[in-house]
């Protein structure tokens, strides 16, 4: 293993991923990490804003185009990485989500991420999860699909990967001012 470790951050241009990128690049004790941010559009304004915000980080930040619904793009991005920070979303831009079937795309994304991480032999996988509300409530609340699907992805990661850490930030509201880098 080289002295520089590659960490791949999914969702690098959105709230959680952007915060992870910022944390990895801002602390001197983490200078041995090279950060690879994944985004669907490396030429988009969020990607450019991320690069601009971290232009003083030297060559430690690179952006790569990848999509959670394209397992091969994830595998290519994960090659040679030590760790992955993964987040899945319950929404698809421009599409209204109302039913369980509408939200199953999140499971597909999670399956792709975990499978690519396994194939790339990722040493440590960090995933933002949520509790399984159906299980926690003893079945009383059984239609909180976003939570339950994230919990299923977490279980899959723990079962399939060498080392997995789950962060449970809870459900939160994103305020317009939090979009700033």
List PLM regions with ranges.
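Aromatic "clamp/platform" in nucleotide-sugar-dependent glycosyltransferases that forms part
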Residues: 106, 110
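Oxidoreductase cofactor-interface core, primarily capturing Rossmann-like NAD(P)-dependent enzymes
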Residues: 2-34, 38-53, 69-72, 90-105, ...
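Rossmann-like NAD(P)-binding element
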Residues: 79-93
């Amino acid at each position: 293993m080289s002295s520089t470790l590659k960490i791949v951050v999914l969702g690098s241009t959105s709230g959680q991923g952007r915060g992870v990128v910022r944390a990895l690049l801002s602390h001197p004790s983490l200078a041995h990490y090279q950060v690879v941010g994944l985004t669907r559009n490396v030429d988009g304004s969020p990607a450019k804003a991320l690069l601009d915000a971290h232009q003083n980080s030297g060559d430690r930040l690179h952006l790569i185009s990848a999509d959670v619904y394209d397992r091969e793009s994830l595998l290519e991005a994960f090659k040679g990485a030590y760790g992955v920070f993964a987040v899945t979303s319950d929404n698809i831009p421009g599409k209204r989500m109302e039913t369980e079937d509408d939200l199953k795309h999140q499971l597909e994304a999670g399956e792709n991420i975990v499978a690519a991480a396994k194939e790339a032999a990722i040493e440590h996988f960090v995933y933002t999860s949520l509790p399984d509300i159906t299980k926690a409530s003893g079945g009383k609340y059984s239609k909180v699909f976003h939570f339950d699907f994230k919990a299923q992805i977490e279980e899959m990661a723990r079962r399939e990967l060498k080392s997995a850490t789950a962060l449970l930030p809870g459900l939160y509201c994103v305020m317009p001012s939090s979009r700033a880098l």
